[in-house]
Curated annotation (Swiss-Prot):
Its EC number is 3.2.2.27. HAMAP family: UDG (MF_00148). SUPFAM superfamilies: Uracil-DNA glycosylase-like (SSF52141). Keywords: Cytoplasm, DNA damage, DNA repair, Hydrolase. It comes from Corynebacterium efficiens (strain DSM 44549 / YS-314 / AJ 12310 / JCM 11189 / NBRC 100395). This is Uracil-DNA glycosylase. It holds the Pfam family UDG. One of its GO terms (molecular function) is uracil DNA N-glycosylase activity. One of its GO terms (cellular component) is cytoplasm. It is found in: Cytoplasm. It catalyses: Hydrolyzes single-stranded DNA or mismatched double-stranded DNA and polynucleotides, releasing free uracil.
Length: 238
């Protein structure tokens, strides 16, 4: 989606059954119990469209974090909600559409910490983090949609129940999992993760990165934990 393109505005969001959701089939059992909330959210997004406010990311991208197999998730990174700038958000937390410039400042700080932590040169041409997702890193926002230009605007509309179901299910599996929780809002879900090892620090936003995010070494720490759990480390390079 070009940076200057406006958010899509479909007439209606049609999420009647679990089969209507663009998710990997392995997630259906996890999200089926919250299908009522998802239907209500579809009606809410339809109303937002009809009122002229719209939403981000575009409907096909809302559930992108769930398009990878449930059983293959080995790292969970939790964000707040999508980037509110049209053309930026694409359904994965902290990730941007290919070609977005300048990069969001939180993502710039993530790349800075990754370079320091791993001792590598980061030459990412954009902020597309799908290479991480393909290795089993779930980039999940706590709230999956946002009103364009209005950060945190869909908080409390029902997405929290949906993502809580996903986080809880991940924590209950008998498979390796490491959670990276940046900032207080992300750390509030730790109670849903059971005995999952969690890496916590300040958020990478410019307001808080210098208060404990820089120097926290989350990427190398995650790989050490994965190795201890018998899982393949992540190649964080993009």
């Amino acid at each position: 989606m070009p940076v200057d393109e406006q958010p899509t505005t479909p007439e209606a969001v049609q999420w009647r059954t679990i089969e209507d959701l663009p998710i990997h089939p392995s997630w259906r059992k996890v999200l089926e119990p919250v299908m009522d909330q998802i239907r209500d959210l579809g009606q809410f997004l339809t109303a937002e469209t009809q009122a002229g406010r719209g939403f981000l990311p575009p409907e096909p991208d809302i559930f992108r974090a769930f398009s990878y197999p449930f059983e293959e998730v080995k790292v969970l990174i939790l964000g707040q909600d999508p980037y509110p700038t049209p053309g930026h958000s694409m359904g994965l937390c902290f990730s941007t559409q290919p070609g977005v410039r300048p990069l969001p400042r939180s993502l710039v700080n993530i790349f800075k910490e990754m370079a320091t932590d791993l001792g590598v040169s980061i030459n990412a041409t954009d902020g597309d983090l799908r290479p991480w997702s393909r290795q089993g890193v779930m980039l999940l926002n706590r709230v999956l949609t946002v009103q364009p230009g209005n950060s945190n605007s869909h908080k409390g509309r029902g997405w929290e129940a949906v993502t809580e179901a996903a986080i809880t299910a991940l924590g209950q599996r008998d498979q390796p999992l490491v959670a990276i929780l940046w900032g207080r809002q992300a750390q509030a879900v730790q109670k849903f993760l059971g005995d999952t090892p969690c890496i916590t620090s300040a958020h990478p936003s410019p307001l808080s990165a210098s208060r404990g995010f820089f120097g926290s070494r989350p990427f190398s720490t995650t790989n050490r934990m994965l190795d201890d759990l018998g899982a393949t480390p992540v190649d964080w390079r993009l």
